[in-house]
């Protein structure tokens, strides 16, 4: 019996690189499994439109949800708008293996309802400062995978990368993390391996 597609929540502050991560995962996986994306924006469908422009997935496999108000409510306390989008995608594409659910930009406290996401990936931005891992919000400390993005910017913003990674390790304990440069595709392979290992995602072999 099928349990339906693996649902992966992608969260993190505005500008951390969530949409870039979503785009890179689509580019890496769209030819290896049946997948779709749901994006959450407060008043627009900007992220969904950005993915459509990038042409990483057919437009009909991308749903843009306008959350209004606080974006974290739509992924946690009242996930009904996202659950409806999941149900719609499953009706349209019964063979789905993977749905990526990108939250609207939010703070370190954002978490996904377990009803909505099987796994959660949280993205932080190296340029946001040295102390981000030490703030240890639930998204950063308890997500299934943490992505520390834009590590190439560290020398330009006065961040000591070795210390940032040590603080990240301390905040995460045994939970995995990836040091990444999403725009250049650095870290994408490790994230794909995580989805296979922890989510049981079955992929066709690479061409």
Curated annotation (Swiss-Prot):
Source organism superkingdom: Bacteria
Function noted in UniProt: Facilitates the functional incorporation of the urease nickel metallocenter. This process requires GTP hydrolysis, probably effectuated by UreG.
Matches recorded under Pfam families: cobW
Signal peptide range in chain numbering: none
GO molecular function terms noted in the UniProt entry: GTP binding; GTPase activity; nickel cation binding
Protein's name in the database: Urease accessory protein UreG
The keyword Nucleotide-binding appears for this protein: yes
Keyword Cell division among record annotations: no
Family note: Belongs to the SIMIBI class G3E GTPase family. UreG subfamily.
Gene3D superfamilies xrefs: P-loop containing nucleotide triphosphate hydrolases
Complexes and interactors: Homodimer. UreD, UreF and UreG form a complex that acts as a GTP-hydrolysis-dependent molecular chaperone, activating the urease apoprotein by helping to assemble the nickel containing metallocenter of UreC. The UreE protein probably delivers the nickel.
Chief localization: cytoplasm
NCBIfam families attached to this UniProt entry: ureG
Binding site for GTP: 12-19
Keywords per UniProt: Chaperone, Cytoplasm, GTP-binding, Nickel insertion, Nucleotide-binding
């Amino acid at each position: 019996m099928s349990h339906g597609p693996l649902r992966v929540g992608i969260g993190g502050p505005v500008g951390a690189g969530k949409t870039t991560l979503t785009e890179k995962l689509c580019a890496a996986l769209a030819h290896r499994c049946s997948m779709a994306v749901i994006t959450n924006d407060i008043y627009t469908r900007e992220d969904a439109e950005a993915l459509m422009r990038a042409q990483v997935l057919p437009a009909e496999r991308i749903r843009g949800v306008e959350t209004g108000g606080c974006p974290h409510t739509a992924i946690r306390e009242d996930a009904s708008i996202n659950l409806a989008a999941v149900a719609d995608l499953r009706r349209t594409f019964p063979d789905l293996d993977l749905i990526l659910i990108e939250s609207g930009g939010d703070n370190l406290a954002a978490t996904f309802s377990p009803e909505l996401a099987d796994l959660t990936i949280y993205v932080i931005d190296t340029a946001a400062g040295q102390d981000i891992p030490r703030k240890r919000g639930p998204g950063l400390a308890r997500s299934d995978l943490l992505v520390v993005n834009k590590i190439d910017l560290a020398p330009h913003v006065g961040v000591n990368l070795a210390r940032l990674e040590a603080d990240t390790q301390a905040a995460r304990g045994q939970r995995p993390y990836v040091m990444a440069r999403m725009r250049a595709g650095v870290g994408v392979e490790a994230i794909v391996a995580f989805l296979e290992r922890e989510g049981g995602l079955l992929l066709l072999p690479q061409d």
